[in-house]
Regions:
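Basic nucleic-acid-binding interfaces
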Residues: 1-73
Length: 73
């Protein structure tokens, strides 16, 4: 398994957009993204750098592996 990259929240949102996620809304520093089929909803904090555990949880909710995600960056 690859190491998780150190990225910002906005970079994560752009990468998830490439696999069909769309920004649903934003409240404060949290961006809610949603994909229709298969249904998935993730919340990405708009921070300068995402913690490894936070990024891993986002990927788990999105149904992506670390390798798949790094190819999207």
């Amino acid at each position: 398994m690859s190491k998780l990259p150190v990225i910002a929240g906005r970079e994560c949102v752009k990468a998830l957009g490439r696999v069909g996620f769309a920004v649903r809304r934003q409240q404060g520093s949290h961006i809610v993204l949603r994909r229709g089929s298969p249904f998935a909803q993730v919340v990405v904090p708009d921070h300068r750098t995402l913690d490894r555990g936070t990024l891993r949880a986002i990927l788990r909710h999105a149904g992506l592996s670390v390798d798949e995600f790094t190819k999207l960056l």
